[in-house]
Design a protein with these regions (language model features):
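Short, surface-exposed basic-aromatic patches at helix termini and helix-loop junctions that form
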Residues: 19-28, 118-125
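Active-site-proximal specificity loops/subdomain of glycosyltransferases
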Residues: 37-106, 115-116
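Short His-Asn-centered micro-motif
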Residues: 5-10, 33-34, 106-109, 128-131
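N-proximal low-complexity "stem/linker" segments adjacent to membrane-targeting elements
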Residues: 1-25
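Hydrophobic/aromatic beta-strand patches that form the interior of the parallel beta-sheet core
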Residues: 31, 63-65, 105, 126, ...
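Short loop->beta transition adjacent to catalytic acidic/histidine clusters or analogous donor-positioning motifs
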Residues: 3, 24-38, 59-63
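Conserved catalytic core of nucleotide-sugar-dependent glycosyltransferases
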Residues: 111-187
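Conserved acidic residues
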Residues: 3, 28, 102, 110, ...
């Protein structure tokens, strides 16, 4: 069984460095999906490619996926979400060699799961509820719409590859167990 940490990447170089360093001892592969377009549909440079020398010590663990095809929805009311979702969907391109029992983490680059909670994983889709911070670690958010006021962000998703391949059953998502205080998010 291997652990694959999967996330879209825009340009958050310091957060990427923190994430790779923090999860390096437990993760077998990092699947970094970088789009050629911003969430607004504008062309963007590939920041990971420009800075990959900074991450040389992780190069044998990194699978860098370049998402370069997008639906033509620029100008639609929700086009920013369409570009974001389409980039995130590129994660599957980096999981071609996975086995059914491999563990898949799906996050944003700024969502840091508590690795001590990984042992609680029982094969069901799991959502880590994470502490959330804005801009600095002393600016914790304690009340926002996603969490009924408990200051926890529904962040990292953990599931096995067998479930990932068959993500058509919405009921499995509804039955998710939430791990409280399973780490933090830094925006």
């Amino acid at each position: 069984m291997k652990i694959f940490d999967c996330f879209p990447f825009f340009n958050e170089i310091p957060l990427l460095d923190m994430r790779l360093n923090y999860l390096n001892k437990i993760v077998d592969k990092f699947v970094i999906v970088e789009g050629t377009h911003s969430h607004q549909g504008k062309l963007k440079k590939l920041y990971y490619d420009e800075n990959k020398s900074l991450f040389k010590k992780y190069e044998n663990k990194i699978i860098h996926i370049i998402q370069n095809s997008y639906p033509n929805h620029l100008g639609d009311t929700h086009s920013n979400f369409i570009y974001d979702y389409h980039t995130r969907n590129g994660i599957s391109k980096g999981l071609k060699k996975c086995l059914d029992d491999d563990i898949i983490l799906i996050s944003d680059v700024d969502e840091f799961p508590d690795v001590d909670k990984f042992s609680l994983f029982n094969g069901n889709l799991t959502i880590f509820k994470q502490l959330m911070f804005y801009f600095k670690f002393n600016l914790r958010v304690k009340n926002f719409d996603h969490d009924n006021g408990d200051g926890l962000w529904p962040g990292t998703r953990m599931l096995n590859f067998k479930m990932f391949k068959n993500m058509t059953n919405v009921q499995k998502i509804r039955n998710t167990k939430v791990k409280k205080y399973a780490w933090w998010r830094f925006d």
